[in-house]
Design a protein with these regions (language model features):
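Short, low-complexity N-terminal intrinsically disordered segments enriched in polar/charged residues
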Residues: 1-51, 164-167
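A short gly/proline-enriched turn/hairpin at secondary-structure junctions
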Residues: 17, 37, 57-73
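Hydrophobic pocket/interface hotspot
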Residues: 32, 49, 57, 112, ...
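Short, well-ordered alpha-helical segments enriched in acidic and aromatic residues
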Residues: 42-66
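Surface-exposed, charged secondary-structure patches
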Residues: 67-122
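A short, polar/proline- and glycine-enriched secondary-structure boundary/capping micro-motif
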Residues: 70-73, 122-126, 154-162
Length: 167
């Protein structure tokens, strides 16, 4: 039983990487959205998800105070991110979809700007939109996500048109 204030350790099952998930940039991005998405009460695919990220991955969330003025970066390692997000994702039936992307690649490294929309099945409402920035590297055999940085859309900070679906 967890004590008051303790964070639950989310278990991560061992899994082998799927070739279709890690052989291309497009594949790894598709998989990253699939693994965190699911219905209310449906466990997330954390074993599969873990195979996408480098052992030393960092997640960085950009946070604004209630007035929208002060901006801070919150950094998580892999387990911290799961521990903080799993309950919400499962309880609310969170689903995140990619809206558009821009890939910049040089040799074995790539940066991807990927716009997203997050919806909760419990209410059917869109609860977040923004841009994920993925830093990836290719080790000669497969792609790895090294960092994932994101910022949410606001009225003052809309998603750029080039990262939205064409009308």
């Amino acid at each position: 039983m967890e004590k008051q204030g303790e964070v639950r350790q989310v278990p991560v099952p061992q899994a082998e990487p799927r070739p279709e998930d890690v052989s291309t940039i497009e594949g790894i991005l598709k998989a990253s959205y699939e693994t965190i998405s699911g219905g209310v009460g449906v466990p997330r695919q954390w074993g599969r998800d873990r195979t996408l990220f480098a052992p030393s991955v960092r997640y960085i969330s950009i946070l604004k105070d209630k007035t929208g003025g002060i901006v801070k970066a919150r950094t998580y390692d892999y387990q911290e991110y799961l521990n903080e997000s799993d309950d919400f994702l499962v309880r609310q039936g969170f689903t995140e979809v990619e809206l558009g992307r821009k890939i910049e690649r040089f040799g074995n490294v790539a940066t991807v700007l990927s716009s997203y929309e997050g919806k909760v099945q419990s209410t059917g409402k869109v609860v977040t939109r923004g841009v994920n920035i993925f830093s990836l590297y290719f080790d000669g055999k497969r792609w790895w996500i090294q960092t994932m940085l994101w910022d949410e859309e606001t009225q003052q900070n809309p998603i750029p048109a080039e990262l939205l679906p064409k009308k």
